[in-house]
Amino acid sequence: MKTLERTDPVAEYSAARASAVVIPRSHEGRVRAVGRDRLDLLQRMSTNDLTAMEAGEARLTVLTTPLARIVDLLWVLNLGERVLCLTSPGRVAVVRRWLAGYIFYNDQVKFEDASNDLGQLGLYGPRAGAVANAMVEGAAALVENRFLERDGALVLRGRPLAGDGFTIIASAAQIETLREQAIAAGATPAGEEAFQMLRLAAGWPYGDHELTDAYIPLEANLWPAVSFSKGCYIGQEIIARMESRGKLARRLSGLRLDGLVAEGSEVRAGETMAGTVTSVGTLPGLGPVALAYLKTALARPGTSVTVGETRGVVVDLPFV
């Protein structure tokens, strides 16, 4: 059995790419929605079509402001008599307050903070399915965006990270036991630094880095979380207009850099202000990289840029 001792972020990142890692995610938020109108309210408040969701199905969706700015990216899991929403770290209060502000007098729905009641793990890497199946029988047979519940644990096959990706949710008292089971099944224990390296390599927008009210979902490359055939929702007009005209002011892009830079730094293409750096890291085999929102005309791969005195080039996402 592997020990519970972590190694180092680079070794953990390499383990994810070669096999599987288990990473604590309990600092991300969990909101339980109950009541007759739980899905109806989420439907009229967010970008994806949630009306036809079956029990056992999960979908990504974005809460947006009337100006189509991002409030948060949610996983919405249909558990039949209730719904579980997974939020970004530190966003539970914001999400609950935002949703509560649009409840009409005859709506039957309540949003409860389940973050302390439930714990969360992430399993990533090409062997994540085998590890998940050793923990909860049947997990490996799940298709993407589906989940099952067994013996008090919920297992969701979500977006692949380093080859595959599962989210495990269980009671706070049970989650450490499940982590130990994952390690016993061959997963390497990893931490937040390794997760950030993995999601950076994948080009995922995340939390307070890219998922803020400065940006619109399409600019964040969140097209799979947006339905263009559903009815009205908060911010829908602006998003539909951007899609129909095919004109985005900016786009989340990758940068290969000669050195590390600070998040929030300006990106310039010659004398032109091109955009803003939102995430920075060093990836094995690639060196310093960054995510940045760039003006669309300057977001073409191969475009030379500078961040302060550091040179770089725009590249396609994902990095790996």
Predicted feature descriptions by range:
Residues 1-71:
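Acidic, proline/glycine-enriched N-terminal capping motif
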Residues 9-18, 61-73, 104-107, 147-156, ...:
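Short amphipathic beta-strand starts and helix->beta connectors
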Residues 21-25, 30, 72-199, 205:
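Acidic, low-complexity central loop/insert segments
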Residues 35, 85, 123-125, 168, ...:
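Residue-level signal for inorganic ion chemistry
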Residues 37, 80, 115, 127, ...:
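A generic structural motif
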Residues 55-58, 138-148, 203, 208, ...:
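Glycine-centered loop/turn motifs
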Residues 69, 74, 215, 220-236, ...:
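Glycine-rich, small/acidic residue-mixed loop/short-helix segments
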Residues 167-256:
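Anionic-ligand-binding alpha/beta catalytic cores of soluble enzymes and soluble regulatory domains
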